[in-house]
Amino acid sequence: MHTGSLYPRFSDAEFSRRYTDVRAGMQQAGLSTLLVYGTTGSHHEVQYLSNFPVTREAILVFPGSGEPTLFVQMFNHVPNARQVSCITDVRWGGPATVDAAVENLRERGLAEGSIGVVGTIPFQQYASIRGALPQAALVDFTAQMQQLRFIKSDEEIEFLRKGAELSDRAIEALEREARPGITEHELVSIVEEAYLGQGGKNHIHYMATTPMRNPTVCVPAQHPSNRVIEKGDVLITEISAQYFGYPGQILRPFAIGASPTTEYKRMYDVAVETFNRIAYIPCGSNQR
């Protein structure tokens, strides 16, 4: 991990490894450059190469050689993007980010040939790129990028451990503070307060409550309700806190103010046994 930054950042050696691997894949696919597209909810490939978690929209121009350029929206997001990113050349994307990226390709002499496209690009933006680069062949490189990201480095595993630790904090807070008389909205507050001050961010906090002896839900809800928790309820959870894009995940049920019913205890015991059996699956096993 890079220790001289105000924000979490991987080491220069880690980014060098990523760039080398990605460029080897580009060469194999015959690509001169990549256009890596990201938005607030879908930005993993942009962050993987730039360290910047996209706040609205961003396009990374990533050439086969030379320095990349990161275009971000909005104008007032540029100063922070320059602090967070490992990319030296960070610019505002102007009125249309795709137009700025296309112009950058022209300046580099990369407006023709095969260009890799990474990410889920809205039709309007794709049509703009297609129309502005009639001599270029646009090739979807998303799957290849995702394949490269599947195998985590030692530094990434440390970030995942941090995400897991933050997720554990959330569950521990629920164990302490979940009680009859509070609402599901208050459960969300308990969860987030456990990790926000530690540099964590919310990834998901799905939760639901229901009477154990007369249940009406069987899975955590994606949106909390104003239901007031009662004695004899079960709280079911799916919690993922993230550390700079690297989340943990933990699922735990809680019996509120009473012992678990026979049915819920049986389901819990089966879940624990299933989880423990994962340890017997050897590396390299397939889904069969």
Locate the predicted segments by residue.
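Active-site neighborhoods and metal-handling regions in enzymes and metal-associated proteins
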Residues: 1-288
